[in-house]
């Protein structure tokens, strides 16, 4: 089973301690977003988890726990979004310069095949025009 953690809520950035507790306890419960009464228990034991995909804009809060994930036998990689959007659109993400530094640290530790850079979503507004994206993308 592949655990997608999580495109909806950025678990590494905001819920790292919760995720590590779930892995230690070996399970989590998931509520069906279309039927709130349907709750499923998912085993998170390493023998049942083929890989964990961490979707994040800020992996730094999870990084202190990576040795523990390794020692427990979890296989994982990061889909790492770096955008550099203006604060009006993305107030909770670290600055692009900081995330680029974190990306380098994570790639050094895990290897380039386990840290995938993403530039999305691409949003067009009066502030983030096509020209903004061309200029913003270059230094990243």
Where are these regions (language model features)?
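Generic, well-ordered alpha-helical segments
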Residues: 44, 95-98
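Generic detection of long, well-ordered alpha-helical segments
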Residues: 9-16, 96, 130, 134
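Conserved C-terminal portion of the radical SAM core fold
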Residues: 98-140
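Alpha-helical context
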Residues: 79-82, 93, 116, 120
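Conserved Radical SAM active-site core
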Residues: 1-89, 105, 110
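A short acidic (Asp/Glu
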Residues: 63-66, 89-92, 125-133
């Amino acid at each position: 089973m592949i655990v997608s953690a999580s495109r909806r809520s950025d678990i590494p950035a905001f819920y790292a301690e919760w995720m590590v507790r779930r892995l230690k306890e070996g399970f989590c419960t998931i509520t069906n977003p279309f039927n709130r009464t349907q709750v499923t228990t998912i085993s998170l034991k390493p023998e049942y988890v083929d890989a964990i995909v961490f979707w994040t804009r800020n992996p730094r809060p999870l990084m202190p726990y990576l040795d523990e994930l390794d020692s427990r036998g979890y296989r994982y990689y990061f889909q790492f979004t770096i955008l550099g959007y203006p604060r009006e659109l993305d107030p909770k993400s670290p600055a692009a310069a900081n995330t680029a530094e974190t990306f380098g640290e994570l790639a050094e530790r895990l290897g380039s095949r386990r840290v995938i850079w993403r530039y999305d979503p691409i949003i067009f507004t009066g502030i983030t025009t096509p020209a903004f994206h061309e200029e913003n993308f270059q230094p990243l």
